[in-house]
């Protein structure tokens, strides 16, 4: 477990989701190098191109790729998280003696920073594979459906591990604070989905949520967004590195949230045309195998990525290695878990977000998109134990006390009943269903400490009331643990009657009988 420093000097950010479980009458470039998603436009035969606000009069239709040819024609944008693929290939084409060559496959890699160009090429059959995030795949799902193209996403290469986030001026600490503020985002980017995710998960009114979404200021890319923030033109910016680091060095700015606290919100993977994958399952499996083998080279070999991605040209080994810290590699065990459960959940969240932004998505694609049939043949070769380098945060008792009063970034409330004067749920199945939404958020924000506070409705203090509130907090915590949440992430507190929000004899007294659940994220 890693020990975290806890201070109030801007290096530590506490992120809180409050889930008020109210006892009834009985008782939250994706990396800093990726460009934003451009509006649809005709492909420019595999070259990089800028964005445009004009949509074409015609859109590509799914063409037939040559499924007799087992060569993988793949597009990647410039991002360090794709490094294992470059390393396994030893360049843009498969080199003799490379990992892919030893596995008997050939891969042609095209560096395309424009997702519209790459997705058009995937649709027409010029490409049979492309690298995207779950966020972007959800964005493109409607386009693929309209074109009649079926795709699968059989492997993920990495999580964003701190390369993406939301920065704000001092004094802007909560989702409620976003109302009326100038919020800049790279248009149709993964960074934009971060703001929308928190807004959608909050207890703001629908009108307030829509106001924040509608008033976001759109920029062409994250660099423009970050520069506008530090030029004083914005109050809040969704962006990526190096602008997150700049915020920690600025006395009037701070990081509201970064992906160090949530691996799954932004994940990179490879999308294949289904017709190609079905025709060549062994090739897809070998491709996945090669990625896993090349993970060992992630922080030791830098010549291949430097030779094929312009952003790394002339960059030292030390600088590239430092950038590697913004992406955490995924192996067999991580892919098994993500494909089976995490990815579909995140995909649905991203569909919600894109729909709230006025885009058309294909929700049903999740039923076939995350297909593990190409991964499972490798089960005997790789361990099912995660090799993740992420470790739970370890807090001292003193640090736990310090974080109790930090302001909540995001508030979310739900209602569940306890049996009067007990810590038992009045309707367990109903309570579990309510808390499952929170468990989903907890799994997404997997780098956070969870503080559970029990409360009661009582005019006067009593030891028994204090004990009851603590037991109710523990009851909620036990359910989280039963759902797989690490108990090391949990803190339970009994407030007794010290945090009542209504007169104990009023019609609103039930509001006092609640359990508050806080997500607290501490950044180094």
Where are these regions (language model features)?
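Extracytoplasmic/secreted proteins, especially bacterial periplasmic and envelope-associated proteins
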Residues: 80, 84-87, 113, 117, ...
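Periplasmic OmpA-like peptidoglycan-binding domain that tethers envelope proteins to the cell wall
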Residues: 428-429, 455-524
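Secondary-structure end/capping motifs
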Residues: 278-362
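Hydrophobic single-pass membrane-insertion segments
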Residues: 24-41
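N-terminal Sec-pathway targeting helices
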Residues: 4-19, 25
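Periplasmic peptidoglycan-binding/tethering modules of Gram-negative envelope proteins
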Residues: 361, 374-449, 522-524
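Pocket-lining segment of extracytoplasmic ligand-binding domains
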Residues: 134-136, 144-145, 205, 209-313
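Short, glycine-/small- and polar/acidic-enriched structural segments
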Residues: 36-219, 235-241, 264
């Amino acid at each position: 477990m890693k020990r975290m420093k806890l201070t109030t000097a801007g290096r530590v950010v506490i992120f809180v989701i409050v889930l008020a479980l109210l006892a009834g009458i009985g008782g939250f470039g994706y990396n800093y190098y990726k460009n934003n998603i451009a509006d649809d436009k005709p492909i420019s035969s595999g070259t990089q191109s800028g964005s445009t606000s004009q949509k074409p009069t015609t859109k590509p239709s799914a063409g037939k790729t040559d499924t007799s040819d087992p060569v993988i024609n793949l597009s990647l944008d410039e991002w360090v998280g794709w490094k294992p693929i470059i390393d396994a290939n030893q360049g843009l084409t498969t080199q003799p003696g490379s990992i892919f060559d030893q596995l008997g496959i050939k891969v042609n890699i095209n560096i395309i920073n424009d997702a519209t160009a790459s997705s058009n090429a995937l649709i027409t059959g010029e490409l049979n594979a492309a690298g995207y995030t779950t966020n972007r795949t959800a964005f493109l799902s409607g386009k693929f459906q309209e074109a009649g193209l079926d795709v699968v996403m059989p492997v993920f290469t990495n999580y964003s591990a701190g390369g993406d986030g939301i920065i704000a001026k001092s004094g802007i600490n909560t989702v409620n604070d976003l109302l009326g503020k100038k919020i800049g985002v790279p248009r149709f980017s993964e960074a934009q989905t971060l703001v929308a995710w928190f807004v959608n998960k909050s207890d703001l009114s629908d009108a307030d949520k829509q106001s924040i979404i509608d008033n976001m200021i759109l920029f062409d890319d994250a660099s423009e967004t970050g520069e506008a923030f530090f030029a004083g033109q914005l109050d809040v910016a969704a962006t990526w590195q190096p602008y997150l680091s700049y915020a920690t060095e600025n006395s009037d700015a701070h990081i509201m949230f970064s992906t160090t606290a949530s691996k799954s919100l932004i994940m990179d993977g490879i999308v294949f045309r289904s017709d190609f994958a079905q025709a060549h399952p062994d090739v897809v499996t070998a491709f996945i195998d090669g990625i896993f083998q090349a993970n060992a080279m992630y922080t030791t070999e830098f010549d291949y990525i430097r030779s094929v991605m312009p952003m790394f040209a002339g960059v030292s080994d030390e600088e590239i290695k430092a950038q590697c810290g913004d992406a955490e590699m995924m192996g067999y065990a991580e892919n098994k878990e993500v494909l089976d459960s995490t990815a579909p959940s995140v995909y649905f969240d991203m569909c919600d977000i894109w729909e709230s932004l006025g885009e058309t998505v294909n929700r049903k694609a999740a039923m076939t998109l995350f297909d593990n049939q190409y991964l499972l043949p490798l089960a005997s070769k790789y361990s099912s134990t995660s090799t993740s380098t992420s470790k739970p945060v370890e807090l001292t008792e003193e640090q736990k006390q310090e974080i109790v009063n930090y302001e909540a970034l995001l508030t979310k409330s739900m209602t569940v009943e306890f049996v009067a004067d007990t810590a038992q749920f009045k309707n367990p199945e109903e309570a579990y269903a309510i808390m499952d939404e929170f468990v989903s958020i907890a799994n997404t924000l997997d780098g956070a400490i969870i503080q559970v506070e029990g409360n009661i409705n009582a005019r006067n203090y009593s030891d028994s009331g204090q004990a009851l509130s603590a037991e109710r907090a523990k009851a909620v915590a036990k359910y989280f643990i039963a759902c797989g949440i690490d108990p090391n992430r949990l803190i339970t507190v009994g407030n007794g009657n010290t945090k009542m929000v209504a007169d104990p004899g009023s019609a609103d007294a039930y509001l006092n009988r609640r359990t508050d659940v806080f997500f607290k994220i501490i950044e180094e």
